[in-house]
Amino acid sequence: MAKLFTLCWKYLRAIVLIYLCLFAGNAIAALLPIAIPGSIIGMLLLFALLSTQIMPARWVKPGCHLLIRYMVLLFVPIGVGVMKYYDQILDHLGPLVVSCIISTLMVLVVVGYTSHYFHRERRIVGKPDAAEGEK
């Protein structure tokens, strides 16, 4: 019985901590003059707490595993809600497809150039050049 109570406490604590970060993010978003969603601010707050180890990762790990395990079910209502606007999506299908293609190509180009920049061949300090080695 004690083991069951401990397990329930871990799940409850994890979900409460995640929701507290979400509610804090919503409160901060309501106070800010810029339009950043509260869920994004809450996620950044949770990330900051975890990365500075103010909140140990083991406290939220059970809740995160639970949410990730059933993430597919969380997207079903969103998909059904999108189908409510099927006629509008069909009317604007061309611009939607073009914007998806352009944004995908832009991401590919930026990632390609960034990858080339960070993985370029660099000179090793103190190693003689090939031209100097031949002399």
Curated annotation (Swiss-Prot):
Keyword Transmembrane helix: yes
Subcellular location(s) per record: Cell inner membrane
Xref: InterPro entries: LrgA/CidA, Uncharacterised_UPF0299
Topology of the protein relative to the lipid bilayer: Multi-pass membrane protein
GO cellular component: plasma membrane
Keywords for the protein's UniProt record, in alphabetical order: Cell inner membrane, Cell membrane, Membrane, Transmembrane, Transmembrane helix
Transmembrane regions: 4-24, 30-50, 63-83, 93-113
HAMAP family referenced in this protein's UniProt entry, alphabetically: UPF0299
Family affiliation: Belongs to the UPF0299 family.
Name of the protein in its database record: UPF0299 membrane protein Spro_1570
Organism: Serratia proteamaculans (strain 568)
